[in-house]
Amino acid sequence: MANASLHGIKTDLDGFDTGVYSSRNDLWYNTYELTLGQQYKFEKNGLRLSLGCPLELYSQTLDDRIRDDKDSYVHLLVTPNFSAKYEWLDWSADANANYSKTVGDPGGIYNGFIMTNYRSFQRSYVEQLSETDRMGAGVGIGYRSAITATFLRISGNYRYTRDNQIYGTRYEGATSVVQAVDQSTESNSYRLGFDGSKGFDWLQAMVRASGDYSYSTSERLIDDTVYPFHSSTVSISAEGSITPLPWLNLVLNGGCSWNTSRTDGSSDYPTRTVRSAYEKLKINIYATKQLTLTASVEDNYNNLTVKNRHAWFGDISAKLKLEHVDLELRLNNIFDQRQYTRVSYSGLDIYTQTSQLRPRNAVLSVRFKLL
C-alpha cells in the first residue's frame, strides 16, 4: 500500500504578546508512506496462533519558510503483533502482545503561535519530530456455558509508552499556552478486570457483576516543571432482573467508582478522590397484552459536586397497542431535577460537566400502522 499527502500551515497572530518568538507560521511539508503487510496464522485442535509483522517506510519533507529551514526524515517502522487463543470445552484462554512506533506530524514543529480558542494559544518548543514507542501485553481466561447460562471472564493487561517529547500547559492569567518540549517521558498502565453473569430458569432471573482496577504512572509538564504522578481507579457494578409474576418484571442495577491522582513527592497539587455511584430500579407491568406500564427511579451521586450531590431522576410511561394505532404517554423527570453535574479525572486535571435539564414534562406519542 502506498500513500502520499501534502500539507501547509500559514498563520498570523495579532494582539497577543509573543515575546521573542514569532507570531507567524509559514510551514509546508509532505509525507510518503509505503507499507508491506504480513500476517501468519496457525490453527489446530482448539489452538489458534496469529503473528503479524507489517513494515512501513515513512518519509517526510519539511520546509519552514519563517526559519528558512529545510529538512527530510526517513523512518523504517516495524509493528509486530502476536495473539494466541486456546479453547477446551466451555473454557478459553487467550494472550496477546504488540509493539508499535509512530512518528509525529511535521506540522507539529511549527515555530510561531497558533490561537486555538479565545483563551488558548499553542506553540511547539521542539526542533525534531516526536517519536512514540508503545508496547502492550494482555492475558485472559473465560468460561461460557449456554446450558447453565453461566458466563465469566477475568483479564489483565499492561501498557508501556515512551515519547521523546513531553506536553504541558503554561498559564498566563486567564490564558493558557500549550507547549511541547524535547524531553523524554514514560508512562505505564496496569489493569485487572472481571465480568460474570448467571441466568436462572425459575422466575426468569439473571444476575451480573463486574469490576475493574487500573493503575498508571506518568509525567505532566506544568509551568515549566515536570511532575511525576500516578493514578488509580476502582469500579464495581452489579445488575439483577427477576420476573416473579407473569405480568411483573423488576430490574435493579447499580455501581460505584473511586478515582485518585497524586503527584510523587510534591504537595503543589493536593490529592482529591472522585467518588461516584448510581442505583436504578425499573418496574415493568404487563397489565394486558396491549397495555404496558413502566416506572423507573435513579440516583446519581458524586462527592465533588458543589450542590445536589444526589441527583434523583424518575420516569413513568404507559404504552397501549391497538390494531392500527400505538399510543404512548411519558411523564419525564418526575422529580423535576433541573441540573446534573458529572466530575471526572484525566491525569492531574479534574473536569466538571454540568447539564441544564428540561423541567418536569409529559409527552404523548401516536404511531399509525399503514399496513
Language model features by range: what are they?
Residues M1-L371:
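Exposed, low-structure sequence patches enriched in small/polar residues
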